[in-house]
Swiss-Prot record:
Residues 1-65, 105-137, 339-367, 875-902, 953-1013 are annotated as: Disordered. Residues 954-965 have a biased composition (Basic and acidic residues). Residues 1003-1013 have a biased composition (Low complexity). Its main location: membrane. It comes from Aspergillus oryzae (strain ATCC 42149 / RIB 40). The gene is acrB. This is Probable ubiquitination network signaling protein acrB. Residues 993-1002 have a biased composition (Gly residues).
Length: 1013
């Protein structure tokens, strides 16, 4: 939103705004709200300074009679015309109202004009009061510069954007809502009257977009938001809304700061690209794949990045409230950009020549405004080229102004560098308050439609009302309410004759000069209270494209009603006049002095008079030419009229016309006959046509049959070609297969030849290995023979000792039985009819108890009825549990006794069934168990009940071992009985050990075989 330099300067500075007043003096400001073309900023418009003022009482007194007579004559002569003209223009734009001071005293409406002395006294009193009111303590320039900040839209915008991006989402939503409710959309920069109807679409009555345009743009952006924007784009658009808020509040949208938009959008875009998870994965993946950076380096420095940049999950969609606010803000931003672009394209191009231009015409240019703003001088109100109320500065002269401007600029930069954010907030506050006052002022005068004078009904007009109705290149039209004072005391003091019935209650001064060419007329036939328009007037004799300060003063009290600053527009091409006004050497940023204004008005009037004379001469010449041309045409018509009265010529002409008619009729009849003949076809031609048609059809059939034959032949040829191609392909494939087979056969042949060449050496090596293996096997067999001999001797010893033990057991059992019988006989009680007495029969309580349970204890100490026997040192049953115990463990053998003990006398307590089933007992030995020949769990061991007594044939075993030697993977011989060793097996088949009663040995057949191989 472009800042209004006038309001900004007024808000920061309270220096003298009424001209080059003396230091320490302050002239009282008049309250004013003058507006033009629907644009206002709510700032007061001060009166002209002393340098642009004249001695009104003296000038009034010197020319009072002449002016009064002139005004009265002009009013009487042109009263009806001007009033009707003003009434016709009554529906012009209402440009505001300006009220006088509250302490202003009004004279009587029809009072007399005071004398010169009275006017001088009133003027002097007013001057003294204004001096007293303005004699405040002067402000130190250093203090003033320290409180004024130079306009820096870029810094302000970036500071506000950074602040907005740090706010939480809830506060951001509130800020966007407040911004959207205010809808700060400034005008595009050009007046609406200079644009075509295309721009009027974006132009509302108060300089803002119309309601229909806002709704349409919001709907279009909302549709685009929902259809085409994904989640990342929606979040980016939310931050773009923050950018728009920052640009608007920071003033970054002004014409010479267009780069702020690009910078802010670029900052937000870079932040979103860095925070995007997809882009991070893409960039890091390519950097790692290209080995530009290593994963270790990345993990080492990744913790330095903020947590916001390390996203682990994609962004979520914004809420619908923030989406609607962002859509509205972006839509209004797009509308403002379109309006500015259209206004810039339609605005007149600035002159590029080195000629001097009128300073008053260029007083409202943006460059001069910026220069005036940077100089920091005080200003007075006038209308700029863009239609806004601008207040240019009152310049200092020479070196003092340049030095003070540099100091002020340097101190302002120091303040901004120390506290940039607070400077931005201060600038934002000024901008917001100015726009708020602007909108509030416009809401009183422009509420959606063009304001008319009828809309002022009900407005309080106690202090009077003056407003501009039309501004032309050479005139300003205005209207006023009832400005007649009702103060009876003042009216009683007024002498009769000073203000008559036809005199106006106010007069107009332009640029401090009493303007004589002002036409003021009173509206006739206006009922009291029915209309607010009581006076209409026109200020004429003005120059185009110049700034004027129009002061409205009361005729009775000489007090100002209001002061309006107006800039006349550029004259049209048809009314363009080359100005011959001399341009001052120094450009002026305020309205001209009264003398200069009068001179310019006189020169302009003379130029207009000369132009009108020139146009009159040209019109006279044109009229003469037109009159002569009309006279020539009249003479021609008269001559033709007089020459057309001859009857003979008329008769000849009629005969000629009749002859032409007859010839035309005859030609028409001939053409009709020819048409009838063309409709009837001759029979000969019809027969010939039929014959030619039949011939054509026959030829066509032949042609079609020939085409079919050609197509058939082509298809047959194509099939043959395809078949041949397939045969060729199969032949090529077969040839390739044969070539591959030939290659493989050749390779096999070469390998066979090489193997045959190396065959003798291989046989010798194998024979040597076989001989060494046989020697090893012979050694192993000898070792086994020794072990077998020692084992057989141990077995015989065990058998002898076992027989002795069984004999001892039988003897003990017999002794025990005899002892029990004797005890029964000794302890027998007298018999009773009921039987034995309770407690007399001790052994009958356990009739089913086996004798082994009474005589057998744990196998570890082998005790029997208190008699302990030492355990056998090398008994094969040393680790076997008692066959009677139900919970005995069997770590080395099943409960069934080995087969070599069956020929010994068996105990009646040893008949126990095998816990293994028949399938397990008779299962085949696995080939992976290489030590199956010495296994304790062989099938012959479990089937020992069907075997004869233990017999061991060592010679047969040796023969079988020799047959099975030489190969580790040979199957076991079916004719050889497995060795039922009573000793526990070793844990590995590669090595084994055994011990007997009288010998020991190491090794196993399988281990020996493995070593031999």
């Amino acid at each position: 939103m472009p800042r209004s330099s006038a309001t900004a300067r007024k808000s920061h500075s309270n220096r003298q705004e009424n001209g080059a007043a003396g230091s320490g003096k302050k002239v009282n400001k008049q309250k004013s709200n003058g507006q033009l073309n629907g644009n206002a900023n709510g700032s007061s418009a001060p009166i002209s300074g002393p340098s642009s003022q004249v001695d009104w009482p003296s000038s009034r007194s010197n020319s009072d009679t002449a002016i009064n007579s002139t005004v009265a004559t002009a009013t009487k002569a042109n009263g009806t015309t001007e009033c009707s003209k003003a009434d016709g223009n009554g529906r012009g734009y209402l440009n505001g109202y300006v009220k006088g001071n509250p302490d202003m005293s009004y004279g009587q409406a029809n009072g007399a004009v005071p004398q010169n002395g009275g006017l001088t006294g009133q003027a002097s009193r007013r001057t003294e009061s204004s001096k007293r009111s303005g004699s405040n303590t002067s402000i130190n320039p250093l203090q003033l510069a320290s409180t004024i900040l130079k306009s820096c839209p870029m810094y302000d915008t970036i500071a506000i954007l950074i602040f907005l991006l740090q706010l939480p989402p809830m506060v951001l939503t509130l800020v966007q809502f407040l911004f959207a409710s205010l809808t700060f959309m400034p005008p595009g920069g050009a007046s609406a009257g200079s644009l075509t109807s295309n721009f009027d679409i974006f132009q509302g009555p108060a300089g803002t977009p119309s309601l229909g345009t806002m709704i349409a743009m919001d709907g279009f952006f909302l549709l685009f938001w929902g259809l085409f924007m994904w989640t990342w784009a929606q979040n980016f658009a939310l931050d773009l809304a923050h950018v728009q808020v920052a640009i608007t509040l920071g003033g970054g949208g002004s014409g010479k700061n267009g780069g702020v938009n690009t910078l802010c959008v670029g900052i937000v875009l870079v932040l979103h690209l860095i925070r995007s998870k997809g882009i991070q994965d893409f960039v890091l993946g390519h950097l790692l794949s290209a080995k530009v950076i290593s994963p270790d380096l990345l993990s080492q420095y990744s913790h330095l990045l903020p947590s916001e940049f390390r996203r682990t999950e994609p962004q979520s969609s914004p809420s619908w409230i923030r989406s609607l606010l962002a859509v509205h803000i972006l839509a209004q931003a797009g509308t403002a950009m379109a309006r500015r672009s259209m206004a810039k394209n339609r605005a007149p191009a600035p002159p590029r020549t080195g000629k001097r231009v009128d300073t008053e015409a260029s007083a409202g240019s943006q460059t001069q405004i910026d220069s005036a703003f940077e100089s920091g001088t005080s200003v007075s109100s006038y209308i700029g080229a863009d239609g806004q109320l601008i207040t240019p500065a009152t310049h200092k002269d020479g070196r003092d102004r340049l030095i003070s401007a540099k100091k002020r600029r340097r101190q302002a930069n120091q303040v901004r560098n120390r506290q940039p954010f607070w400077a931005a907030l201060a600038s934002t506050k000024v901008t917001v308050m100015r726009e708020y006052e602007h909108s509030r002022a416009l809401s009183k005068t422009a509420r959606g439609l063009t304001m008319t004078e009828e809309d002022l009904q009900g407005v309080s007009l106690d202090d009077g009302l003056v407003w501009i109705t039309d501004v032309d290149s050479s005139s300003i039209k205005f209207a006023a309410g009832d400005l007649v004072s009702e103060d009876a005391g003042v009216s009683g003091s007024c002498e009769s004759g000073r203000l008559g019935e036809d005199m106006e209650p106010f007069y107009v001064c332009v640029n401090g000069a009493l303007w004589a060419t002002v036409t003021i007329c009173k509206v006739q036939d206006v009922a009291k209270g029915s209309s607010v328009v009581h006076w209409r007037g026109e200020i004429s004799g003005l120059a185009p494209n110049c700034a004027y300060t129009c002061s409205f003063l009361r005729s009775d009290t000489e007090e100002e009603i209001c002061v309006m600053s107006v800039k006349t527009p550029i004259a049209n091409d048809a009314e363009q006049v080359v100005s011959s006004v001399s341009t001052p050497p120094q450009p002026s940023y305020r309205p001209s002095s009264p003398t200069t204004t009068l001179k310019n008005s006189i020169v302009n009037a003379e130029l207009k008079l000369n132009e009108k004379r020139t146009r009159l001469r040209k019109a006279k010449n044109d009229h003469k030419l037109v009159v002569s041309k009309i006279r020539k045409e009249l003479d021609n018509y008269n001559h033709r009229l007089h020459s057309g009265t001859d009857e003979n010529r008329q008769k000849q002409r009629s005969l000629q016309l009749e002859r032409n008619i007859k010839q035309t009729e005859e030609a028409t009849a001939v053409l009709e006959v020819q048409l009838d003949n063309l409709e009837n076809i001759p029979e000969e031609e019809l027969e010939e046509w039929s014959a030619e048609k039949a011939k054509y059809e026959h030829e066509l059939e032949l042609f079609n049959s020939a085409k079919e034959d050609v197509a058939t032949a082509r298809s047959a040829a194509a099939r043959e070609v395809s078949q041949l191609e397939s045969d060729l392909t199969s032949t090529i494939q077969r040839r390739e297969r044969l070539q591959g087979r030939r290659t493989r056969v050749n390779e096999q042949y070469e390998r066979i030849i090489s193997a045959n060449a190396q065959g003798l050496n291989e046989r010798e090596r194998r024979a040597a290995e076989q001989f060494a293996r046989e020697q090893d096997q012979a050694k192993v067999e000898a070792n086994f023979n020794e072990q077998f001999a020692s084992i057989s001797q141990s077995v015989q010893e065990y058998q002898l000792r076992t027989n002795q033990l069984w004999q001892q057991c039988v003897a003990i059992e017999q002794a025990l039985q005899q002892q029990q019988q004797q005890q029964i006989l000794l302890d027998s009680a007298p018999l009773t009819p009921e039987g034995n007495l309770p407690g007399t029969n001790t052994l009958s309580e356990a009739p089913t108890l086996s004798l082994g349970a009474l005589t057998t204890s744990a196998s570890s100490n082998r005790s029997l009825l208190g008699l302990s026997f030492p355990p056998l040192k090398s008994s094969p049953l040393q680790h076997a549990s008692s066959p009677i115990g139900p919970t005995s463990s069997r770590p080395t053998s099943p409960t069934q006794a080995p087969s070599y003990l069956q020929h010994f006398p068996a105990s009646p307590l040893i008949n126990t069934a095998s816990p293994f089933e028949s399938d397990f007992i008779h299962r085949d030995r696995s080939f992976s168990n290489r030590s199956g020949h010495s296994s304790l769990y062989g099938s012959d061991f479990f089937d020992s009940g069907r075997r004869p007594p233990f017999q061991f044939d060592l010679s047969e075993k040796v023969v079988d071992k020799r047959r099975s030697s030489g190969s580790e993977s040979n199957a076991p011989n079916l004719g050889l009985r497995p060795i039922c060793s009573p000793f526990p097996r070793a844990g590995s088949r590669a090595s084994g050990s055994g011990s007997g009663g009288s010998g020991s040995g190491s090794g196993s057949p399988s281990s020996a075989t493995g070593k031999g191989n």
